Amino acid sequence: KAIEEYGVEDALLRLNGMFSCAVIDLKQSKLYLSTDYFGQKPLYLSTDSDLNIAFGSTGRLLIKDVDLNINLLNKRAINDFLTFGFVLPQHTVYKGIERLMPGSLFKVNLNDGTVYRNYEFQNQNYYLKNDLKEDFSSLLNKVMKDHLYSDFPVSIALSGGVDSTLIYGYL
């Protein structure tokens, strides 16, 4: 419904929570891939010179199903891991497979293969200092309700820190 009402890009801006998604707009002949702002639901993609695009929630899916010269390891990613102890968020250890950055939009024109990437796909909110306390409280209440909805029992690990104590207080 949101896509019908607002269009694909505006609807994606309005999404709140953990998500990664793919939308094909047949009227505009465009493919959209997008992830949540924190990258909690990752999305991996691979493209080749013939404009074949494969994507999935894990890089392993792309290794098995796509022959895009990914048998080679990404030496830069491996070097980053050995140097820094982690691989940069947009890279993977496989050559030819990348991870979409958190809060990003990847758009492909299916007619001509033009690719558009936006890593600042965020809705900026500016607050007055006086409104912060009230807005934070109502936002935290909403987020807690959204994230406590589960098919399984929910628990909290209390570390004694401010964040876990605050979350426990809102239960």
Give, region by region, the residue ranges found by the protein language model:
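Cysteine-centered catalytic environments shared across enzyme families
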Residues: 1-171
